[in-house]
Each structure stands twice: as C-alpha cells, then as structure tokens.
Amino acid sequence: MELNFMRILATIINFIILILILKHFFWDKIKRAIDARQEAIDETILKADEDAEKARRLRLDNERILKSAKEDGRKLREEQKKEADRIYKEIVDDAHREAESIINRANIEIQREEEKVKYELKQQVVDISVMLSEKALGESIDESKHRELINDFIEKVGI
C-alpha cells in the first residue's frame, strides 16, 4: 500500500473546507444550542441550590418554631402547676381557717356550757344547803340572807 501524497493532501484540504463550510453555516446554531443547554444546566443547578437553601431555611424555621412551641408548652405547664399549687394552698389554708374557727366556736361553746353547769351546780348546792339548814334548825330562816351567806361561802371555797 503506497502512500499517495497528493491524495492525503487533497483529503486534508477537503476536510478543512468541510470544517469551514460547517463552521460558516452551522457553527452559530451549534454554539447557540450548546450555550442554551449550558444555560439551562446552569439555571437548573442554580434553582436546585436555591431550593436547597430554601429547604434549609424552612427546616431551621420549623426547628425554631418547634423549639418555641416546646418552650411555650413548658412555660404553660409551669404556670398551670403554679396556679394549681396556689389554688391547692388556698383551699388548704381555707380549710385550716375553717377548722380553727370551728374549734374556737366549740371551745367557746364548751366554756359557756361549763359556766352554765357551774352556775346550775352552785344553785343546786345553795338550794340543798338551804333545805338542809331548815331541816336542821327545824324552822324557816330568811331565805335571801341564807342564800347570800351560802353564795359567799361557795365563792370563797372556789366552786
């Protein structure tokens, strides 16, 4: 196989002419198609980056909102617990005051009853003493004077 220099040269020249013709008629269209494709790819990448950034911001916002909601819930629980404790303390304090009031009224009533019983007992002692004196003496004595004497005696004795 022999190399034909003229043929090689003609092929190279034909190839160069073909490239020049293609460049002249089609290079701008190919360049525009490549540029358009590159621009579309760049826009897609940019949009993907923007979407990723937007998703990241949304995630951060959601995390912040969730954290805030948890904190608000915790504060609300604490406030409700404090309010419940306050109401509980108020109820217990009211119950203690009421119990104290009942005990005080009962003590006052007991003192009244005790005074009443003492007075009634004193009157019975006076009546019995007057009756015994009359029986012992066999006659009636001045009852008011006798009662006064007996009352004085009882006061001195401390009944």
UniProtKB/Swiss-Prot annotation:
Coiled coil: none
Function: F(1)F(0) ATP synthase produces ATP from ADP in the presence of a proton or sodium gradient. F-type ATPases consist of two structural domains, F(1) containing the extramembraneous catalytic core and F(0) containing the membrane proton channel, linked together by a central stalk and a peripheral stalk. During catalysis, ATP synthesis in the catalytic domain of F(1) is coupled via a rotary mechanism of the central stalk subunits to proton translocation. Component of the F(0) channel, it forms part of the peripheral stalk, linking F(1) to F(0).
Record-level Gene Ontology MF annotations: proton-transporting ATP synthase activity, rotational mechanism; proton-transporting ATPase activity, rotational mechanism
GO cellular component: plasma membrane; proton-transporting ATP synthase complex
Entry's family note: Belongs to the ATPase B chain family.
Protein species of origin: Clostridium perfringens (strain SM101 / Type A)
HAMAP family: ATP_synth_b_bprime (MF_01398)
Lineage: Bacteria, Bacillati, Bacillota, Clostridia, Eubacteriales
Pfam families according to UniProt: ATP-synt_B
Quaternary data: F-type ATPases have 2 components, F(1) - the catalytic core - and F(0) - the membrane proton channel. F(1) has five subunits: alpha(3), beta(3), gamma(1), delta(1), epsilon(1). F(0) has three main subunits: a(1), b(2) and c(10-14). The alpha and beta chains form an alternating ring which encloses part of the gamma chain. F(1) is attached to F(0) by a central stalk formed by the gamma and epsilon chains, while a peripheral stalk is formed by the delta and b chains.
Cellular localisation: Cell membrane
Name the record gives this protein: ATP synthase subunit b
Residues that span the membrane, as ranges: 8-28
Bilayer topology annotation: Single-pass membrane protein
